């Protein structure tokens, strides 16, 4: 199986496809895939989900996925890695919270935008990224970066809203403490 890597903090790409070029593969990074137009099926970790315009998918590191295209589909891909999340753009106090929430995205197949208001919010942001990317005006890179940051936060909100247990300051901190303890001690005494 093909495994993709990302060698920069984030990358944006646009494509229009009549058929799937990439078969089942996995990443070492996060990927947001926005469907501008088209229909088909997204396969992720052996689960399928029909897609159409306006859907946003979150693919986390280690997920196995592919797209089965039924009608010509326009994709916007936003790829980012842990380096991007740990950069100063999100602020030190938000990094652990954001990372925790994003890592839980793989438990939620299908369109990540479940809040109707956020669906209406994300579409013009994606369109703004496309305009800035094509026109390359003064400060375009900075504007794109800020829009990506906002989309990531909107995605995190949608994930947090539908986690199995309510994520609040206490439950999230406890979960993080448990995960950190396990990670730090899993290979001790072996």
How should these model regions be labeled?
Residues 41-43, 59, 64-71:
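Short beta-strand His + acidic residue motifs that chelate non-heme Fe in jelly-roll/DSBH
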Residues 108-117, 133-147, 153-189:
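Short, Lys/Arg-enriched, Trp-marked, Pro/Gly-tolerant hinge/linker segments that flank
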Residues 26-43, 58:
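Short, conserved beta-strand element in jelly-roll/cupin
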Residues 1-11, 68-131:
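A hydrophobic/aromatic-rich effector-binding and dimerization subdomain
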Residues 36, 52-53, 61, 71:
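A cytosolic small-molecule/anion-sensing beta-strand core signal
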Residues 19, 53-54, 62, 81:
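Tight coil/turn sites that cap or link beta-strands
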Residues 46-58:
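Short acidic-glycine-tyrosine-enriched beta hairpin
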